[in-house]
Amino acid sequence: MLFLIVTTRSVSAQEEPLCVENSPERRGEIGCSIIENKPLPGNLKQPLFWHIDRFETGERVRAAVVPASIAFEAHGAWWRMSIESQTESHHGGQHVTEVKLLPLPEAHKYSMVVISAYIPSGWTSRVHLHSGVEAFYVVDGEQCLETADRAFKMQKGETLVVPTGVTMRLVATGSKPRRAFAAIVYDASKPPTTRMGMETASQLVSCTK
């Protein structure tokens, strides 16, 4: 089951850069950055939420970091992201959103990968799947996620949660580049992402339909 709010656009396909550490996105250029791959504490209790808070300064947000959170700068702001239970505490920051995660796969240990992307409209990710639950938040622009069941369209400020093991391809849609975050909470004994051949894209519901 997937959770989302939707819109629609047509796109043309061009493959976006791979997500890597310290990509050009970190310098305000086109790219997809792995912000951090962080082991999570073993005492987290489901249901879990992805909490996103915005801060005015790097000093303030770094002071609010705990074992299940990270702090970083992206898209003109400072951000704190955490995986924890539902809470009213935003640690001195401005609350942006919280996203309830779907049940995690059974595992002895979990890790969290946080990704930040700045991608032109019409570009697509590679076809892939994850060994855990993925959540998206659109900072600006629009994006669409193609899966075997349907295509999920998202606008600025919207979120989406995807179960473990769903084959997908992400498409930047709309009239301007997409700026977006993703968090993957996954089985730490496995790679977070498995890429698949682009020929498998034909098995997914197109964002152009």
Residue spans for each PLM region:
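Jelly-roll (double-stranded beta-helix
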Residues: 3, 7-135, 142-209
